Amino acid sequence: MSRVKRGVTNRAKHKKVLKAAKGYYGMRGSAFRIARQQVIKSGQYAYAHRRLRKREFRSLWIQRINAAARQHGLSYSRLMNGLQQAGIEVDRKQLADLAVHEPQSFAALAERAQGALSN
């Protein structure tokens, strides 16, 4: 049985981990053992926060819609209910974008929602 030396594969493995840990603070970016632990932990954070990002953006959209709705004398929930009753299907992302970039369009939607609520 011939002896297997792992110089090439080890070098490649270390290089891969240290490349992933580039820019990390202190030994986390330069020492292989510590860098490997940090790369694994970074992957866990990235996985969790890819899911959290969706919640945070939805929350941000709702806050923006609520702020804009209150300028027109409606609460967020009454605006959404009015839009639903008026048969207007606009998702929260688009509605928040309208509230920020096109206040006139948002005002028109708010009026339609208020009209649907009063009927």
From Swiss-Prot:
Keyword Ribonucleoprotein: yes
One cellular component (GO) term of this entry: ribosome
Matches recorded under SUPFAM superfamilies: Ribosomal protein L20 (SSF74731)
Gene Ontology molecular function: any one: structural constituent of ribosome
Signal sequence extent: none
Pfam families per the UniProt record, alphabetical: Ribosomal_L20
Keywords from the named record: Ribonucleoprotein, Ribosomal protein, RNA-binding, rRNA-binding
Record-level GO BP terms: ribosomal large subunit assembly; translation
InterPro entries (UniProt xref): Ribosomal_bL20 (IPR005813), RIBOSOMAL_L20_CS (IPR049946), Ribosomal_protein_bL20_C (IPR035566)
Role of this protein: Binds directly to 23S ribosomal RNA and is necessary for the in vitro assembly process of the 50S ribosomal subunit. It is not involved in the protein synthesizing functions of that subunit.
HAMAP family per the UniProt record, alphabetical: Ribosomal_bL20
NCBIfam families: rplT_bact (TIGR01032)
Family stated for the protein in its record: Belongs to the bacterial ribosomal protein bL20 family.
Name of the protein this chain belongs to: Large ribosomal subunit protein bL20
Organism of origin: Halorhodospira halophila (strain DSM 244 / SL1)
The organism's taxonomic lineage, starting at the top: Bacteria, Pseudomonadati, Pseudomonadota, Gammaproteobacteria, Chromatiales
